């Protein structure tokens, strides 16, 4: 076994942020719920680092506006820390997020109920793509159980299997899910699901590119880009439950495209907040 190294970075977070609120959100995130922790003031998670697909553990703490990210692993720990900042949306300058509340009272209420929430849940576009495949035509609870079983049987001490490992697995899964997971793994190894690259693209262009991966349709591709790459300003146009939430909160006849004009440049964040409130109220299915 390679020697484990530890690396710590401090990052100044611009705009509203609460580690406690984000952690609570992730703990209730059905596709990949965050497990329990021994440290009540920290968020800890285990994942594959995109640049080399090694396993890393990250522990994040907050002191006012500063995030301390400590990563442990045997790979590229600078990349591991950067990835942790991305999947917790700590690398987003959110000083303009409060301005969205000034333009939209519905989002103002959402911000008040979820103070400092930054979207999180998937460690990478690769993991989001794998979830998109697993959850097709299955109940969320059932898909989450399958995902957890894959991690338990084939993962690396709590981390989802790397693409190289996933390609070797002959999984007994419904339909063509095994075939599609192999396609996702191959795409990840080819760089098609690279988080930094998808972040650098215009969101609709990134979604179109991801749809080139076998097994990923419009809904799955949006999930990969908006939640996997954690793009802050994209619009999930294939989320039926979000459309229902728009009708409930803005009134009949209002559309997502109409109300989201006021959300720029944080359309993803606004959508996640509305879905989180719907889940909290018990009127929606688990978030995905």
Predicted regions and their residues:
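HhH-family (HhH-GPD) DNA N-glycosylase catalytic core used in base-excision repair
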Residues: 1-288
